[in-house]
Amino acid sequence: MALNLEKKQEIIKAFATKENDTGSCEVQIALLNERIKLLTEHLKANPKDHSSRLGLLKLVAQRRNLLKYIKRTDHARYVVLIEKLGIKDR
């Protein structure tokens, strides 16, 4: 259920703003987005797994807060990021 190392490195490479960048908002949001996708698939197969559902809600809230921060500080980065990830603009 967790991201494997290769997938995580692939996401970091795709969204990094500079070399060895693992902590920028773009990278964090992309990693959260992938974890949210995995948890969503898990919950489709296991609808009674309430602890995973709560974890999913926490991840979505964390992603939403990071997206709000990027939107507030640099709107151009925000637009590019949501287009790359395929997230709807609220």
Curated annotation (Swiss-Prot):
GO MF entry, a single one: rRNA binding
Alphabetical UniProt keywords: Ribonucleoprotein, Ribosomal protein, RNA-binding, rRNA-binding
Pfam families: Ribosomal_S15
This protein's GO CC annotations: cytosolic small ribosomal subunit
GO BP terms, alphabetized: translation
Family recorded in the similarity comment: Belongs to the universal ribosomal protein uS15 family.
Protein name per Swiss-Prot or TrEMBL: Small ribosomal subunit protein uS15
